[in-house]
């Protein structure tokens, strides 16, 4: 039987999934999420997995990175700063279905933001070096999530990284308690707990990837972060 809090999360609507949400609330939530990514390790986890594909790349190279569901663009910018220390330039493309989010990603600079559907990426096959999505998959249960993974696999040339949340009551309690001293918006506090209970176990994330036709290497990270990575064509 599904845990009652998982059932509650499954039937709840997060602010970023609400087409009627006020733009100011969306932007405030995105800025809170950027702090969560920094403090709880989401940005670091994604960057670590991207490093696996960047390691063979020589200094002086320029590599394209598409971030699907980029939010405020904080994770690709963190990855670019990390790559720059190794002499690699990342050309950042941020894709969002929410116009306010695309504007917020572009506002801080460094990310070429566009509005499009992650289930139908507007790129040719193997036209982007690296493709990332962070904390997006738990918003897309079932076939929409599998379609996103297939599309990411299609457009990537070197590698794909999916970063999300490892489901845990401790993670839910942690984000709830941290939200007060960090002065999160009330919507972020609620949605943070919803997101945790919509998250995955390592086995579940691997199974979703397999059901989309890709074989991913799944890893745990500090801060209840979970990642999956593979090379295009489905080989981990």
Regions found by a protein language model. Give the residues of each.
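N-terminal auxiliary segments of SAM/dcSAM-dependent transferases
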Residues: 1-19
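Class I SAM-dependent methyltransferase Rossmann-like catalytic core
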Residues: 16-19, 23-49, 53
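Class I SAM-dependent methyltransferase SAM/SAH-binding core
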Residues: 66-68, 72-120
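A conserved beta-strand element that flanks and buttresses the S-adenosyl-L-methionine
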Residues: 132
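A short, conserved alpha-helix within the catalytic core of class I
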Residues: 140-151
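Conserved beta-strand signature within the Rossmann-like core of class I S-adenosyl-L-methionine
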Residues: 156-165
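C-terminal alpha-helical "lid/dimerization" subdomain adjacent to the S-adenosyl-L-methionine
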Residues: 165-212
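Conserved Class I S-adenosyl-L-methionine
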Residues: 198, 202-236
């Amino acid at each position: 039987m599904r845990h009652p809090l998982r059932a509650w999360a499954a039937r709840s609507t997060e602010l970023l999934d609400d087409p009627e949400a006020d733009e100011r609330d969306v932007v405030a939530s995105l800025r809170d999420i950027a702090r969560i990514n920094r403090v709880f390790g989401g940005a670091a986890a994604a960057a670590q997995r991207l490093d696996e594909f960047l390691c063979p790349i020589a200094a002086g190279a320029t590599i394209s990175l598409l971030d699907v569901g980029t939010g405020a663009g904080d994770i690709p910018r963190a990855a670019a700063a990390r790559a720059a220390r190794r002499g690699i330039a990342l050309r950042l493309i941020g894709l969002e279905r929410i116009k306010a989010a695309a504007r917020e990603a572009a506002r801080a600079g460094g990310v070429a933001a566009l509005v499009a559907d992650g289930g139908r990426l507007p790129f040719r096959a193997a036209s982007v070096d690296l493709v990332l999505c962070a904390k997006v998959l738990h918003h897309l249960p079932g076939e929409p999530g599998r379609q996103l993974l297939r599309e990411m696999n299609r457009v990537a040339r070197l590698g794909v990284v999916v970063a999300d949340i490892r489901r845990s009551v401790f993670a839910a309690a942690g984000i709830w308690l941290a939200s007060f001293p960090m002065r999160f918006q009330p919507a972020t506090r609620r949605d943070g707990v919803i997101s945790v209970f919509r998250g995955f176990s390592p086995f579940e994330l691997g199974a979703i990837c397999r059901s989309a036709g890709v074989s991913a290497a799944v890893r745990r990270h500090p801060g209840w972060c979970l990642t999956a990575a593979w090379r295009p064509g489905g080989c981990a």
